[in-house]
Amino acid sequence: MMDEVEGSEKIAITHSLGCMNWMLAAMTGQFEKPFDRVLFVAPPDPIKTNEAEGIQGEPMDLHHPEVLPAIRANTKSLTIIASDNDRWLPRGIRIYEEALQQQAVVLPSAGHFSLDDGWGEWRGLVNWVEFDKPGDLLTR
């Protein structure tokens, strides 16, 4: 479905488990054409997600040798935004920064970027989509 739209930029915005789902889809060849831009919002710690009810199997290994090449093959640009107090990321965003060789944008005290954390409309996200400036993501 993501390859059906013709025309302008192909952008994926993923949140939490959606980040891991996107990586898995990239690793298993689910995308026909690479994305122009991908945004990971509040990617979770794979170990923490495995503790959640209903999730089975081994935690995703961010350092698996197929992860980084799959991401690079399936997006021209990856942006990661995380918080310094996300309950689903207890080991911190550095686990993604190291594994994906990508510096994240960190928004202090943003929690898990969810309604429970006081999030609703996010002007910075709209700006990021329109203008492709990661710094815009810091604007609530």
Q: Whereabouts are the PLM-identified features?
A:
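Residue in the alpha/beta-hydrolase core beta-strand immediately N-terminal to the catalytic nucleophile
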Residues: 10-15, 36-39
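Active-site nucleophile elbow and catalytic-triad environment of alpha/beta-hydrolase enzymes
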Residues: 52-70
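Short beta-strand/loop motif that positions the catalytic acidic residue
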Residues: 74, 79-82
